[in-house]
Amino acid sequence: EMQRSLVGSEMCIRDRMYEMIEVVNAILPEDRPRYLMGVGTPVNILEGIERGVDMFDCVMPTRNGRNGQLFTAEGVINIRNKKWEDDFSPIDPEGTAFVDTLYTKAYLHHLVTCGEMLAAQIASLHNIAFYLRLVTMAREHIAAGDFRPWKETMVQKLTQRL
């Protein structure tokens, strides 16, 4: 699968981007933080962390949230899909944002399908909290010394369409 990612103003094939991160990080002083701009799928972030990147910024959590896409530790939810219409379970039972357990998938599906702006706000809050939780978990697994196996498991989950 050829996914493309935007790095600065260059379009790069995903694997080439990871290779370039390694090349650049080998040149940069080790006592300085590494910043990767405009890259932001959860998988990209984990791959970047594995390669020594310290900081990221991207619009993906909010842009995708505005379009009805929710990132979870079990995979990606397109809340616009009819399958969520009657799912009264929490948006993300493992989530850390207040919206994750306060609202249901069915309610968020309803808001999205009728164009209610509250849907974009809820989804954006959820996605930002998920990203924060993801990097917090990454930090914990780095400290525990088991980042790589945890990351491999997470990458498989994060690419699932729910």
Question: Where on the chain are the PLM-derived regions?
Answer:
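Single conserved hydrophobic/aromatic residue that forms the stacking wall/gate
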Residues: 1-8, 12-13
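Alpha/beta catalytic cores of nucleotide-metabolism and tRNA/nucleoside-modifying enzymes
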Residues: 15-36, 42-162
